[in-house]
Each structure stands twice: as structure tokens, then as C-alpha cells.
Amino acid sequence: MTFAEDKTYKYIRDNHSKFCCVDVLEILPYLSCLTASDQDRLRASYRQIGNRDTLWGLFNNLQRRPGWVEVFIRALQICELPGLADQVTRVYQSYLPPGTSLRSLEPLQLPDFPAAVSGPSAFAPGHNIPDHGLRETPSCPKPVQDTQPPESPVENSEQLLQTNSGAVARMSGGSLIPSPNQQALSPQPSREHQEQEPELGGAHAANVASVPIATYGPVSPTVSFQPLPRTALRTNLLSGVTVSALSADTSLSSSSTGSAFAKGAGDQAKAATCFSTTLTNSVTTSSVPSPRLVPVKTMSSKLPLSSKSTAAMTSTVLTNTAPSKLPSNSVYAGTVPSRVPASVAKAPANTIPPERNSKQAKETPEGPATKVTTGGNQTGPNSSIRSLHSGPEMSKPGVLVSQLDEPFSACSVDLAISPSSSLVSEPNHGPEENEYSSFRIQVDESPSADLLGSPEPLATQQPQEEEEHCASSMPWAKWLGATSALLAVFLAVMLYRSRRLAQ
């Protein structure tokens, strides 16, 4: 960082409140001096801590890049912040050495910048403007990459699809040299020609538009360095007609890329011929595999298998328009005998790329295959488990439910259930029946109102009641004896006085 850039950074840091109006997400696409990883981190910080705190990280990342002041001033003018741009320009020019030409800052004073940035334009060589200062159109500049990016595979793929010769690709520098990505891109157009129907073979140019080209905004390394997407290839795998009975002499040659494209026209004609043969062979119901089998040759783990390497698997080729994940078609499920080999049912899976072969093998259900081969009893594995549970064992809760109409009084100890084996046809519930019978004897005795709230058992309350009856009967006997004794004494005294008076 130069002296003028250091002083400019200190000015921005001391006057940070003036720059709070700068929107980080709006100005990021125009800061071409920042790398894509820096812009990704700033966007993540913007979502977490907001715009005001992210400005500190933005200025810290800017001051580590050479020539950041001129880029920042240009970005401020594009974002319609001319006041801040003039302040930064004045401070930056004041610390520059005398006599320094500011050729890069002269276009910034011209008011020919549009207010809004135009959308993404078509990627064409004629639209490129030579770099002479900052007089180019104010479109979003390409961010600085962390590492040296490889040559764009999108441009090479467009030229390969349009010319269909593919021997030489034009690089970004303008020189004509063999493309390093040509061999990796060659199987895709040939595969698209083989998977399409014969009448749609000439419409391969429409697939060029399916590859999006983003020419605006920063692109992270994980997005900008990815290979070509294979969406068009997977769409053709699902919508195209499965052509599996091709001759072995038309296998894909990986020795030279030019010969692979030279065979493209011949492969289309052979694919049309083989498609007509598969329509005639699909009428028959023979399950004898063809004696001529060609082993599958995998060229690379990232390249899809050519459908020509799966030549002549069986003579009963299903003419299904969309290859299903099931091993066999539902139309032929009833006609295939049980002795059909497993290779016949799993043959259509070879037309899928190798990276999807292992996944589809795991996702393939085994239910339809067993129905075709066995054709017998289709009882599931749960039938053996259900047969283990006998009738009395399943009806055990019914015995307990029948006693719910009676009042219940017991503790948690009385509810212990004896262990019983579910495999025994007649389980023994002796301890439970004895406990429940004791409950029935206790419940039949209607308890009194005084004993309902008592926690003690009924048997301990009965002797106490008998003692109370005996204790209550003792005073009445004593009073009766005392009264009879007094009455006898009174009668004796009266009798004695009557005799004395008579004498």
C-alpha cells in the first residue's frame, strides 16, 4: 500500500460515520480488486451483523489490495454517491507526489455514466471493449480470482457444438491451439445425438442455450470453476428412447477426439437402424440372452458411459419411452417365467452414467422382481410373526376388561403381572387369578362409611369394633346390679319398719 492509499484509508476510518450510507451489497459487484472469497465473506457478514458493521471488514479488505482507491472512487460514482467520491478523490490527490499523472481518474469526472447498470448482455467477442483506462462501459467487472482460473469451458463447448468438428478451440487470448478440455467435452454432444430420436437428431443446437452464462456480478470460485452442468444430459436420459441393442464395432474410441466427432453422423444413422430393430424385437417374449456381449469400458469416473458399450444384452428389449427404476416393465411382469436370469431384469440399468449406477442399484426396489420370478404365495414376513401370537394370548386383556364394572381397591404390589412366554399356546396365569380372586372376596364385602377413608385393611378393623361393643355393654350391667341391690335394701328396710309398727 502506497503512502497516499494509507492516508486515504486513515481518512475513511476517522470519518466512518460519513460512509455509513454505502450499501455493501450494492457496491461489492464494482470492487474488482476484491477476490471472490472476500466478497463471499462480506456477504455472509452482511447477513449476520448487518451493513454498518460489515463496512469495517470491507475497508480492511480494500486497503490490502493495490490500486484500491481508484476502484473505490469509481464504484462510488456508479452507486450514485458523488459527494463521497469527491471527498476520497480530494484526499487521495492531496497525498500523491507532485507531477503524478492521474490518467485513471480523468474519466471519473465525466458525467456520462448511466444511473442504473444494464442487465447481463449476450457473451460475444464483438461486445468486448479494449482496455484503455476507465473508459469502458460501467458493467460489473470480473472479480479477482484467488488462483489462476482455467480456460472457460463454456466458450469451448459453444464452439464445439456449433462447428461439430471440435479439433481446435479458440482460447481467451485469441490464438488457435488445441483445447485441453476438448476430450472431456467430446462425449456430451455424441451422447446427446445417440439418445435422441432419429427425427429429432438435427435439433442439437437448441441445447446450447440451456447453459447459463453469467457475465455480471462477482462469482465465487466454487461456482466459476465448476465443469459443464449435465442437466441436458440427464434430461435426455429420462426423456429419450433407450437404445441398448447396438453393434459392438461402434464403441466409443477415446484415442483421439477428432475421430470421436467424425463418427457422430454415422452413429446417428446406426442408432436409427438399431431403434427400428428394437421395435421389432420387443414383440417377442423370448428370454434367451444374446450370445454377443461387449464388456462395459469406463473411460473416466466423471464421464457418462456411452450407450453403445451396452450392445446386444437381450433380444427382448422393452420399448419404454422413459427408463424406469424398476427392474422390469409392468407389461411383461405376467409373461416372464420364474427362470428368467437376473441379468435380463437388470440390463436396462447399464444405460445410466457410472456415477448413478451405484445409487440406482440401491434405490431399485426388490418387490416387483420377486413377484415376477416366484409367482406363488405372496405372504409377507409379518405373517410368521402374527402366527406366533395365539388366540388366548391376544385375549388376555379381555379377561381384565370384564372386571372393570366392579369397584377396585388395591395397591401397586397387587398389580404385578407374572411373566409368560408368547410362544406357549396356553399361558399359565395362576398367580394373577389367585390375586384377582382375593380382590373379589374383599370387594364383595361392602365396607362401612367410616372405613372408606382409613388406609388400614378391613381385617384389622373388625376386632376393634367387637372390643368397642363389649366395652359399651359393661356399664349397663353394673348399673343394673346396683339398682337391684338398692331396691332390695329399700324393701328390707320398709319390711322391718312395718313389723316394728305392728308390734
UniProtKB/Swiss-Prot annotation:
GO terms for cellular component: mitochondrial outer membrane; mitochondrion; peroxisome. Residues 497-503 are mitochondrial intermembrane. Residues 356-365 have a biased composition (Basic and acidic residues). Residues 153-158 are annotated as: Interaction with TRAF6 1. The modification Phosphoserine is found at residues 152, 157, 172, 186, 220, 251, 256, 384, 418. Residues 431-436 are annotated as: Interaction with TRAF6 2. Pfam families: CARD_2. GO terms for molecular function: signaling adaptor activity. Residues 337-503 are annotated as: Interaction with DHX33. The keyword Cell inner membrane does not apply. InterPro entries: CARD_dom, CARD_IPS1, DEATH-like_dom_sf, MAVS. Residues 143-147 are annotated as: Interaction with TRAF2. CDD domains: CARD_IPS1. It is a single-pass membrane protein. Both CARD and transmembrane domains are essential for antiviral function. The CARD domain is responsible for interaction with RIGI and IFIH1/MDA5. The transmembrane domain and residues 285-420 are essential for its interaction with DHX58/LGP2. This is Mitochondrial antiviral-signaling protein. It comes from Mus musculus (Mouse). The lineage of its organism: Eukaryota, Metazoa, Chordata, Craniata, Vertebrata.
